[in-house]
């Protein structure tokens, strides 16, 4: 997939803010690396990988997330590295690989993280036209988010459900 196609495909947009965030995360990664704060460094690397995904540097983003996954001992970073890998694969058009990564991430998920995995699986299933499964995944994510009283995330999931309903009409 060419860079222009990838950028068109993404819901996230390349803006100055993305580059600004990337520079800040690179700086923080350097600071955490120099101060031997491994888990914080890994987290910054995942945020950097997400910025790289948005910019369209998906191979680099995938390698970075995979490297964190293989080197971390943090369950949280295992989840997020696998989840970021799934997002990168989805945004580069590898829906099968993305689905596998999102499902794999659930092995490392706490309840809240599981809701992110379910919501992203739902988005993936909307994109491939599997609306019934997408709706089930959105409803599961919504139930978790309501139970945890995460109003900001509940709204995000409700927006996804409304978008799916709009597609069906």
Cite the ranges covered by each PLM segment.
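Structural signature of alpha-solenoid helical repeat junctions
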Residues: 40, 77, 113, 153-156
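Eukaryotic all-alpha helical interaction scaffolds
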Residues: 29-33, 52, 65, 69-72, ...
